[in-house]
């Protein structure tokens, strides 16, 4: 996934293109929506 950044997060996340939710099984704990993509943390 491409790197992305959310406000208030010190590290980068994974950018998932054209998704409204983060996929399961990757250990993501938080996210922020960047229409039409989503940024999932931690990468």
UniProtKB/Swiss-Prot annotation:
Keywords: Disulfide bond, Ion channel impairing toxin, Nematocyst, Neurotoxin, Potassium channel impairing toxin, Secreted, Toxin, Voltage-gated potassium channel impairing toxin. It holds the Pfam family Defensin_4. It is found in: Secreted; Nematocyst. Gene3D superfamilies: Anthopleurin-A. Disulfide bonds join 4-39, 6-32, 22-40. One of its GO terms (molecular function) is ion channel inhibitor activity. Its main location: secreted. InterPro entries: BDS_K_chnl_tox (IPR012414), Myo_ane_neurotoxin_sf (IPR023355). One of its GO terms (cellular component) is nematocyst. Acts as a gating modifier on both Kv and Nav ion channels. Voltage-dependently inhibits voltage-gated potassium channels Kv3 (Kv3.1/KCNC1, Kv3.2/KCNC2 and Kv3.4/KCNC4). Slows inactivation of the voltage-gated sodium channel Nav1.7/SCN9A. Inhibits all Kv3.1, Kv3.2 and Kv3.4 by about 50% when tested at a voltage of +40 mV. May act by binding residues in voltage-sensing domains S3b and S4 of Kv3. Tests have been done on human Nav1.7/SCN9A and rat SCG neurons that mostly carry Nav1.7 channels (EC(50)=300 nM). This toxin also reduces blood pressure. Belongs to the sea anemone type 3 (BDS) potassium channel toxin family. This is DeltaKappa-actitoxin-Avd4b. It comes from Anemonia sulcata. The lineage of its organism: Eukaryota, Metazoa, Cnidaria, Anthozoa, Hexacorallia.
